[in-house]
Every structure is written in C-alpha cells, then in structure tokens.
Amino acid sequence: VRLADPRRLLGRNALLPSPSGGGGGTAVVGVTMELLFDDGEGPAELDSCETRLRAELSALGASVGLPTVGLVVRRHKTGATVGLPAAIDTLRTAIDVLEWAGVLAGAAPTAPVPPVDAAALAQRLQAERNPTLVTLLEEAARRDVPALLYDDGISLGHGEKSRTWSTGVVPDVGAVPWGELGHVPIALVTGTNGKTTTTRYLAGMMRAAGVVVGATSTDGVVIGAEQKESGDWSGPGGARAVLRDPRVQMAALETARGGLLRRGLAVDGAGVAVVTNVSDDHLGDYGVHDIAAMADVKMLIAHGVRRDGCVVLNAADPLLVARAAGVAAPIVYFAVDARHPVVVAHVAQGGGVCVVHDGVITLVQGRARTLVLPIDDVPLCFGGAAVHNVENALAATAAGHALGLPIDALQAGLRSLRAKHDDLHGRSLVREHQGVRLLLDFAHNPAGVAAALAFLQRLRARDAVPGRLIVLTGAAGDRSNDELRGVCAAIAAARPDHVIVRELDGYRRGCAPGEVPARIRGHLVVAGVAPGVIDAAADDQHGLTLALDDARAGDTVAMLIHIDGPGVARLLTERGWPD
C-alpha cells in the first residue's frame, strides 16, 4: 500500500461530516491522505494497513499530545481516503502525525522521510498552537462574521465588509472592528458542465444592478472592470482573492471539484449555491470513482449555504434531486420543461422554480409567476437550440432572483453574454464565413460533447442546412478509456462525415506522442465511425486548417476540446473569418 497526497482540509469537505447549513463555524476541518493499492494488492492488504494505522496513530498522537479521535477511512476501488478531524491551530502537526502513522503502519511514502521524532513533533505542536486565533475564530462564529484563513493571512468578513491581517498577525478580539465586518451576497456555482457560463451570467446580472462584482472562473479573477488574474482561478485561491478585496460588494464564484477535494470549501455561509448537473468527468481523483461520489462532492456547496439562503438545482438531474432532502437551505429547481414531474411536485409543495413557459424564462413561486425574458432575447440560447445554455440561463436567473436582484438586472445579465471570444473564451462560439458554420466549444466530456453536437444538429435542422459535419476532437493524456469511449460515442451518434483527431501538445500527461490520438481513433471506430473518414493532426491549428480546407459552403465544423485560443484566433483572422 502506498501513501499519497497528505494535505490539510481547511473547510467543509466530503470526508469529515459537517451539519448542513453554512456559517457559524459549523464546518469540520482536519487532515487527509490517500492509501493506494500497489499492483496485485486488494482489500486484505488494506485491512491490515488500516489496523496498523489506527494503532500507530493512537500511540503517536498520545506521545505528541494530539487528539486522534474520529479517524475516517473511506474505501474505494484504488484504496482508501483517510481523514482525521483536527483543531485549526494543529493542522500542520496533524498532517505530519497522520503521515508518520501511515509510514509506521507500512505504507510506502512518495518521498523519503526522516526517522520519526515524537519529541520534536510535540514541540512543533506547542509552537503551532494559537489560543488567540482560536478565540478570534470562536468570536467571529458567535457574531456570524465569516473568516478566511490560509498561509497568506487571515481575513474576517467578506469584500467591502472585510479586514485582512498578514501572515503571523492575529488580532486580539477586542482590537477587531466587529461593527464593520460581515457578509456580502455570494453565489457559488459548480457542476460538471455549465459552471463558467452560469457564473458569467450571474456576474453580468450583479453588474447590471450597479454594484462592484468580484467573479472567479476557469478564465480568471475579475474585480469590477479589472482582470486581476488570468487562467484557472476556480479554486479556493480565487475565492480568497475576491472576498479579501475591499471593493467587492457582490461575488459570483465558480467552484471546481478539484479545490473541494484538495482543500475543502473555502466559503462557508454563501447566500446561494447553484449545482448545474453531474456527469462522467474527472473520475478517479482523490478516491472519487463514480458519478454518485462526484455528486456528493458537488453538493458540498449546497450544504455550505446559509439556512436563510437558497440552493438552485437541476430538476432533470436525478442525482441532485435525490440529495436535495439533506440540504438545510430552501431548494429552487430549474428545468427547460415546465411540466417536469420534479418541478410540478415542488411547486405543489410551495417551492420555487425557474422554467421556460411559452418560450419565456419564468419564475414560479406558488401561484405567483414572474416573466423574466423570452428565450429568443437571450443570445446564447440561439432561439432555444442551445438547450444547455437555456439551462445555464435558468440556473443563473433563479440564483440572481434569490439574491434579491431586480428583474431588469436579470434581463440585462441574460442579454450581456454573446457568442464572441471576449465573453465566452471557447464556449458555444459560433461563427460563419463563406457559407461555412464553425463552432468552437470547450466541451470535453461525454455529456458536454453530446450537448454541443445536439445544439449544432438543431441549428442545422432549423436552418435547413444539408451540408456535411466535420468534427475536431482530442483529449488530455489522463483521460480514462471510459471517458474517451463516452466522448467517441457522442461524436459517432452525430454521424460526422469527417473526424480530425488532434494531439493536445502540453496535455499528454505522461503519454507518448500519438498515444492519445491512437486511443481515440480506436474508440471512434468501435463506436461506428468509418476508419476512412478519420484523420490525424499535430495540434489545434493544424487540425483546424485541415477542417477548413475540407469544408465547403453549407458544411458545419465543430472544434471541441478547444485549447489553443490565441493560436486559433490568429488562424481564423488570417483566413478572413469575422470575430
């Protein structure tokens, strides 16, 4: 058995149980690590390792003076995830103790470690303990003032109602300006697909209400009109960057599963949480091997919402519906189909929903109906052809309404996103040139690819376009064969006339050049795509060049799993494509 990924859990997490309902210091923190099978190992070896681990942890904890009660061992098909609750001012020592107990139990570490020294660990624990910090956090919880704690300092309150102290500085309770500290309205957004678009919709709605908005996503951090960071900031670091900024009056935070699994939920006590959907993507990390386990991870943000807040869920996702009963905050469902059984039952029980009724985005609460905006007036919905973006618009509308945004702000936010690069960065970008239609979409998992291609098929049917369908695809090297099979099945179901499989340079993740495209080609053939219509490309620009050279007026090109945005943009400009 191998030991891997020892880490601190600094917020609400899927391993150490916390009561539903955010705020008030209810989240249980601690430390965790993975125990992974070596080749040929199985449950028997794990049984033995767990027995020894519990004994070694108890003995070492007693020697060091660290409580070790409440060890959690969650088994999965590649081993187990181990978690230990610990006080916030003991986490660094606790991770050392847990890791050492694992080594003493016979688990092989990922790197050499020095001999265990219980006396040194005990001294480290005493140095780490910080009664002033504990008292401060207890007082903040009593006053319902949110706290953010990390290596770069501690902050109390959020946004314009926050104060931050640098690393090593912990103020006395009496020195804190408590009357100036508190919450700002926060929306958390997660899900397998639609996170970024929904977050962008929400940020647009907030801006339209006239407030300074902090937003995070896989595209960066934006405060007001300033792009503070670029790249993927959908983890805890992005949330801290926004909520420690004293300009921020409202926040829309994309919350990816990676950060939830590595560190826990950074923000406890948000006003609203949105879970768009859960499907097959990123399985296998940190012991999450099936969609049900992933749903539990995604729903962490729902349990972190204040009891007087709101949780927005997809009525068409049975995994989310099944978990709604355990959420402390009220539920609002969204659905394209206003007659969906979950929607009908929820309304009958007095619950709120956001649906499409007679072509109009509509909020329903009991007998009251509020018409928001016709789908035809939401650019990214393409008259309803982009069903996935209709769902994103519904989710954002429900969340914005729950935060108290006025209807005109909801409308402005829905109109604000258009199919251009600056707005969407590779999500549902549709362009046309000389009779050829091009879709650039980040879709990279089976559900996302199926949704993107279904959208194109609806556009083609609506516009009576008889031409061919050319699909460009690829994958990162860490994608499982199950994920690749699902993506290839979705491509095959669209009956493409030409498929170009490209290498994603920089994303091979340990695979040899050509290895991933060869796997994709094999899965495409098994799914029913004729070998003669499959070509290979060296990268994004090469693949798109092949596709556009082949395309004729009336044809549709779908470039999925879009990576090299600037390079593709330059290529299209050089070929005369309008932005």
Q: Predicted regions: what is each one?
A:
Residues 288-295, 299, 329-450:
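Adenine nucleotide phosphate-binding catalytic loops in nucleotide-utilizing enzymes
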Residues 1-185, 208-209, 213:
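Preference for protein termini
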Residues 182-186, 215-224, 271-283, 375-377, ...:
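Gly-rich Lys/Arg/Thr-decorated short loops/hinges at beta-loop-alpha junctions or inter-strand turns
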Residues 153-158, 219-223, 359-366:
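Short polybasic amphipathic segments
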Residues 175-219, 227:
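Walker A (P-loop) phosphate-binding motif
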Residues 1-64, 68-71, 76-78, 386, ...:
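ATP-dependent carboxylate-amine ligase
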Residues 140, 216, 254, 276, ...:
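Residue-level signal for inorganic ion chemistry
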Residues 223-333, 338-342, 377-382:
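Flexible active-site lid/hinge loop adjacent to a nucleotide/diphosphate
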